[in-house]
């Protein structure tokens, strides 16, 4: 093989990435039309299609490379030269960071995730950090309130590319101004101007306007979820201006945004200012670049593990029957390994568990299911594993371990955001915090069900609490589609003795679920039971679940809000929410600074 072959292979990989990202942008660009046409099922299909594109194009490139090399063996020096040639193609390449991740994916597919060394892969980027200061097209546009905030917001909304009429633009502008005045006060608002992203961020049934409230000493998020009414008219549902609210909107438990980003790195840097608590991995994940987010997540792990003296330990909480979960005490992620053998009541295979995790990756997570990154042949230093955990790994997942002396290799694991297990949280809180947690738990189940997901095992231990107090589901081995479940009432006992029998007096088929039985484990705690009955008693009735099933089967797609319903303009300013009525801010026109 000649030296020219290395360049040909490098060019083939980069061209394959160009094709993949071109299709990625093509699918993304259809988001506006899907929104305008209210084609919500197409929204869901496009989300899955875009996720599958990456692996599909990696496979195409792998087949091309096998043809190019004609099945000849490739030694280490040859592979290093290919990477060197690829590196030389990247200095002027606009998406170099994701192109490196694509190279890694091709290599892993070719060599079955083995020999994953920094010499052969882009474990760390080969390129210096690039500030995106000169762009072929600006990412955002500035708006100044010289003629008042009403005029400014009118210009912002009129500049949107959406081709639908507004339900009542003047009313929505009044709502936004009132919300800004409540959040900032008139004097501070008078010192602000807006910077608004040129592209809308589409997700579920909303088109998000994402911007920045730029003040002399700080910058805040400015987020407007724009919805489409059943009559085909646009309206703004709320205005979010805090970092915590923005963090939830861009959260790890939500589906990826559809936002047209030819330069994703530049968009990530632009977003960082209003999402200071998000890591680089989380920002790439939010805009749909999930494979590069995996690369960045691994880099964040390496950065942490090389600078700490902690040891891996079993994660807090009740030990799972399917997954073995461990963590580093100060790290914000957990590592999940499928056990070799499951508890007897778990009649499933490892392949089934992996399929469930893939379902979650592709499905609308509605802010209630944690995203995961999947890794193969993950290497750990033994000195950084607590002896008790190492013994547990060897006992429970020994078939997935390869002992390399001072290191072990785990053939397959998931990395997921670390949360406080809900059962531990409920033990620690009282009063309003307890009430909020129970309300969140029930809301999580409702929203999952509305998205056609039945959690299966709804024990508190299978849910976690985020730093924002949201309850998120994270145990996926028993999930299924709502439409696959048969929700039944428990038949009345035939005789008084039936209720005392160890076996049910009625037949139970696969897929049967009896919501009345939820009460036994959800309401057993006297601190929790009355709260659950007060707020979520309908979850204990089979007819509630069947009604949801019917809505799903009839094609209804529920609205998903990344904020509390009490923040919706229709709730906050409900008396003035009629389409034919404009809204006047409480304090009238905002004063302009001199």
UniProtKB/Swiss-Prot annotation:
* List of catalytic residues: 371
Recorded GO terms, molecular function? [isocitrate dehydrogenase (NADP+)] kinase activity; AMP binding; ATP binding; phosphoprotein phosphatase activity; protein serine/threonine kinase activity
Q: What is its EC number?
A: 2.7.11.5, 3.1.3.-
A GO BP entry: glyoxylate cycle
What would be one Pfam family of this protein?
A: AceK_regulatory
Catalytic activity from the UniProt record: L-seryl-[isocitrate dehydrogenase] + ATP = O-phospho-L-seryl-[isocitrate dehydrogenase] + ADP + H(+)
Entry's InterPro entries?
A: AceK_kinase (IPR046855), AceK_regulatory (IPR046854), Isocitrate_DH_AceK (IPR010452)
A single GO CC term, please?
A: cytoplasm
Q: Which UniProt keywords apply?
A: ATP-binding, Cytoplasm, Glyoxylate bypass, Hydrolase, Kinase, Nucleotide-binding, Protein phosphatase, Serine/threonine-protein kinase, Transferase, Tricarboxylic acid cycle
Q: Which residues bind ATP?
A: 315-321, 336
Coiled coil ranges: none
Q: Is Flavoprotein tagged as a keyword? A: no
**Which subcellular locations apply to this protein?**
Cytoplasm
Is Nucleotide-binding one of the keywords? yes
Please describe what this protein does: Bifunctional enzyme which can phosphorylate or dephosphorylate isocitrate dehydrogenase (IDH) on a specific serine residue. This is a regulatory mechanism which enables bacteria to bypass the Krebs cycle via the glyoxylate shunt in response to the source of carbon. When bacteria are grown on glucose, IDH is fully active and unphosphorylated, but when grown on acetate or ethanol, the activity of IDH declines drastically concomitant with its phosphorylation.
* NCBIfam families assigned to the protein according to its UniProt record, in alphabetical order: PRK02946.1
Q: Which PANTHER family match?
A: ISOCITRATE DEHYDROGENASE KINASE_PHOSPHATASE, PTHR39559
| Homology family | Belongs to the AceK family.
Protein's UniProt name: Isocitrate dehydrogenase kinase/phosphatase
Its taxonomic path starts at: Bacteria, Pseudomonadati, Pseudomonadota, Gammaproteobacteria, Enterobacterales
Gene name of this polypeptide = aceK
């Amino acid at each position: 093989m000649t030296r020219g072959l290395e360049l040909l292979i490098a060019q083939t990989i980069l061209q394959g990435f160009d094709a993949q990202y071109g299709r990625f942008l093509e699918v993304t660009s259809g988001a506006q039309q899907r929104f305008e046409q209210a084609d919500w099922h197409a929204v869901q299909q496009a989300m899955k299609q875009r996720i599958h594109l990456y692996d599909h194009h990696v496979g195409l490139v792998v087949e091309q490379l096998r043809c190019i090399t004609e099945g000849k063996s490739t030694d280490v020096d040859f592979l290093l030269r290919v990477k060197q040639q690829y590196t030389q193609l990247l200095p002027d390449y606009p998406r170099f960071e994701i192109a490196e991740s694509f190279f890694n994916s091709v290599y892993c597919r070719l060599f079955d995730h083995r020999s994953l060394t920094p010499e052969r892969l882009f474990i760390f980027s080969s390129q210096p950090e690039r500030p995106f200061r000169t762009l072929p097209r600006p990412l955002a546009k500035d708006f100044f309130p010289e003629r008042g905030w009403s005029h400014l917001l009118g210009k912002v909304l009129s500049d949107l590319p959406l081709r639908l009429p507004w339900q009542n633009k003047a009313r929505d502008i009044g709502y936004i101004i009132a919300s800004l005045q409540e959040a900032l006060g008139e004097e501070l608002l008078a010192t602000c101007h807006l910077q608004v992203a040129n592209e809308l961020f589409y997700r579920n049934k909303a088109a998000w306007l994402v911007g920045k409230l730029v003040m002399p000493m700080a910058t805040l998020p400015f987020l407007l979820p724009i919805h489409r009414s059943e009559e085909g008219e646009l309206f703004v549902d709320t205005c979010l201006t805090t970092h915590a609210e923005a963090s939830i909107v861009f959260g790890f438990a939500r589906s990826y945004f559809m936002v047209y980003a030819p330069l994703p790195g530049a968009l990530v840097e632009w977003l960082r200012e209003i999402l200071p608590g998000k890591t680089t991995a989380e920002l790439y994940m939010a805009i749909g670049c999930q494979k590069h987010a995996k690369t960045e997540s691994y880099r964040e792990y390496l950065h942490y593990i090389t600078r700490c003296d902690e040891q891996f330990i079993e994660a807090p909480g009740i030990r799972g029957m399917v997954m073995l979960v461990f963590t580093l005490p100060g790290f914000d992620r957990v590592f999940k390994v499928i056990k070799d053998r499951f508890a007897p009541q778990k009649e499933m295979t490892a392949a089934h568990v992996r399929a469930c995790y893939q379902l979650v990756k592709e499905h609308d997570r509605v802010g209630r299911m944690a995203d995961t990154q999947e890794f193969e042949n993950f290497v750990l230093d033994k000195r950084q594993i607590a002896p008790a955990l190492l013994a547990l790994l060897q006992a429970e997942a020994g078939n997935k371990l390869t002992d390399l002396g001072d290191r072990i290799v785990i053939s397959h694991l998931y990395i997921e955001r670390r949360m406080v297990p809900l059962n531990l949280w409920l033990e620690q809180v009282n009063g309003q915090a307890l009430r909020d947690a129970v309300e969140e738990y029930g809301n999580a189940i409702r929203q999952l069900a509305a998205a056609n997901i039945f959690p299966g095992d709804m024990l508190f231990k299978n849910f976690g609490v985020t730093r924002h107090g949201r309850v998120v589901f994270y145990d996926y081995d028993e999930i299924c589609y709502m439409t696959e479940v048969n929700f039944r009432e428990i038949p009345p006992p035939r005789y008084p003795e039936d209720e005392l029998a160890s076996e049910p007096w009625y037949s139970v088929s696969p897929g049967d679920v009896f919501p009345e039985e939820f009460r036994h484990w959800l309401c057993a705690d006297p601190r929790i039971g009355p709260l659950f009955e007060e707020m979520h008693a309908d979850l204990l009735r089979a007819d509630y679940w069947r009604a949801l099933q019917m809505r799903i089967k009839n094609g209804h797609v529920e609205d998903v809000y990344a904020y509390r319903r009490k923040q919706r303009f229709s709730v906050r300013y409900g008396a003035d929410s009629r389409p034919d009525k404009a809204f006047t801010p409480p304090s009238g026109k905002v004063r302009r600074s001199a």
